[in-house]
Amino acid sequence: MTEPVRWRLSTRSMILVGGGWWLVVESHRMKIIVAITGATGAIYGVRILQRLREAGVETHLVISRWGARTLLHETPFSREQVEALATETYAPADMGAAISSGSFRTDGMVIAPCSAKTLAGVAHGFGENLVHRAADVILKERRKLVLVVREAPLSDIHLENMLKLSRMGAVVLPPMPAFYNHPRTVDDVVDHTVARVLDQFGLEVSGAERWSGEMGVGQEVD
């Protein structure tokens, strides 16, 4: 079966032909960078890759050194299995990769999970590895950057770094569970956050449980 391909349409220009204006539209396959770093919650990155593959989105994957260690510790997946979910993969030390340049067009980047170290590196422009550099490119090009920050409790440093990035236009999206959808399994909890992440890119996840506005049906609430 042929896999679906997600295309994004973007208006480029108007041209005058035979006395009338014609709208010229350029389409491109959606491209999203996915980074998995060393915080707990590697399954979030894996599930995002799975959902993006199902949606036909082209993905560019970077797994940090500690991200790879955490992946093996927390999930049943090998690094090779996770990399097989992506369209392209890069080593974290490959500073010459396509995603290190702003001229390589993408629709954005998600770091899931995002460690406190990665958060600090992106906030302060360290650029010491490809995850930092790719995120720096996304920020300077004014593209969508989503950070699934996994840390608790949060220190002043963490909060200030998140505020700094939010002011730059990044979306800080910690993996907060929702209970209005009555999750039954860990997968349900993970899927809720993944759906919220993909919402940021205008992508709909099949079967996502969303708030309907109904509460306490058949019950009196003070």
Predicted segments, located by residue:
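Short amphipathic, helix-prone segments within low-complexity/disordered or flexible regions
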Residues: E3-V5, L9, V17
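Short polybasic linear motifs
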Residues: W7, W21-V24
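Serine residues within intrinsically disordered or low-complexity segments
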Residues: S10-S13, S27
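Intrinsically disordered, low-complexity serine/threonine-rich segments
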Residues: S13-G19, R105
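A cross-family phosphate/adenosyl-ligand binding-site feature
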Residues: E26-V146, A152-D222
